[in-house]
Every structure is written in structure tokens, then in C-alpha cells.
Amino acid sequence: DGIYAWSEFIPTGGQYGNSHGSYWWGDYGNTEIEFTPVYGMFGAYGGHAGISNYVGSDWQNEGNYSFDLQAYNVTGGHSGTNFNTYFGYLDESGYGMMESLPPFYFWDGEARVIDHMWVTNTTYVYNQAHSAGFGSDYVISDESTFKIVAYGYESDDDTEPTVAEFYLLNVGQNFVTEWTKWDLSVLGKVTRVEFNCVGSDDMYGSYGMSVPGYFAYDDVAVQFPGETVFR
């Protein structure tokens, strides 16, 4: 309560998202998007990382959970200093980090088109997607992939969401290493969007997905009727 500047959410004592807890936020008077972390096996942190301005490229030394708020190989946000980091995934192993996927939603219940957002990898994912532990013998190959899947819901009763995908790691060991535009207009009008992180089969071991379900994002652009510029 009482926090009005995005930068006030950023921890000053380290780059570990869990050290400052999870929180909800709302972009009121602009995109009208609200976000609430979900609760699961690991508490509130099961579905949130946090707002950040931490960046770096030393993926071998800073590619662990202590740097989970760090965007990889960029100099700041897509436009400006700050950006957001997302954590959350569900799989069929029973070891997923939460019981439901953390969503964006329009707080007023109006369905709108989210035109696009800008995304990139975190240093943590870049490291772990090369070679991860966590109950797995995974080592990157030319067939390894890691993607974000977005599910768009037009209403609370919608049981058949529209889907969009974005590959943070594509075949041929092709990583995203800069802010990249992700077209979400294919989802159509939505009241909420849920995100999941999904790896190729080789990334799964005894405890589910061995690569952490993170990505960094910025500048979520929303279409409003009668306006020619995205908010």
C-alpha cells in the first residue's frame, strides 16, 4: 500500500525476487492491467518474480536463483530503466511451482486487445537452459526449446482460450538475447491472459521441468477503442 512509483518495488538488497516477497500491482489510468500473484506449493512466490532494473551478461557466475530478477544481455528495460520479471509454470509432473497460472487481467472486467509486449530471457534461464540440475541430466542440444505460452480468455466463463507462443530458445541453440516484440493481438479481445513456460522433453526430469520458468517483459501495449496510439 502507498507505493505509486514502479521503482519503489525494486529491492535494493539483492537480485533475488523472493527476498522482498510477492505483491500485486495495477497500471491504473494507463493499460488498466492488474496482476496478482498466485498461491501454490511454495506460497505466494509460486507465481511471481517482480519489477526490476537489474541486468547482466555474466551468465556463468550470475545464472542462479540469487539473480532471478536479472534480464540477460540488455542495458535496461525496452524503453527506460525498469521492466518486469515473470515466474510461473504448470506441468504434469506434480512438481509444478503453483496450482494455477498467474494472469494479467483488466481490473474493470472490460475485454480489450493486448497488441504486443516486449520479452527477453533472464540470466537465470540462459544459464540453466545450457545445463540444468534439479533432478535432471539435461544438457542443451540443437533440438532443445523453451517457450512462453499465452492463453487469452474473453470472460471468466471462457473454457476455450486463444493461444500465442514465443520461443526464448529455439532449435539450433538459438536464444533470444535482446528485447523482442511478441505479437499478442492474435489472442483477440481478452479480460485476462495467463502465461506458462514450457520446455522441450529433454528439459524434464524426476521433478518436472529442470529449467526455471522465468522471462523478462516490458511495455505491454493495449488497444483502446477510438485511440490510435497504444497505451
Which residue stretches match the model-derived regions?
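Short acidic, Gly/Pro-enriched loop/turn segments at secondary-structure junctions
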Residues: V125-Q128, T228-F230
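Terminal, low-complexity interaction segments
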Residues: T145-F230
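Short catalytic/ligand-binding loop motif for oxyanion handling, primarily in non-cytosolic enzymes
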Residues: T122-N127, D201-Y204
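Short coil-to-beta strand junction motifs in C2/discoidin
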Residues: Q128-I148
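N-terminal targeting leaders for non-cytosolic proteins
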Residues: D1-P102, G109
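Short secondary-structure capping micro-motifs at structural edges
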Residues: E99-W107, S131-Y138
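Short edge beta-strand/loop segments characteristic of extracellular beta-sandwich folds
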Residues: W118-T120, D137
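Extended extracellular/luminal ectodomain segments enriched in beta-structured repeat modules
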Residues: G109-H116, K189-V190
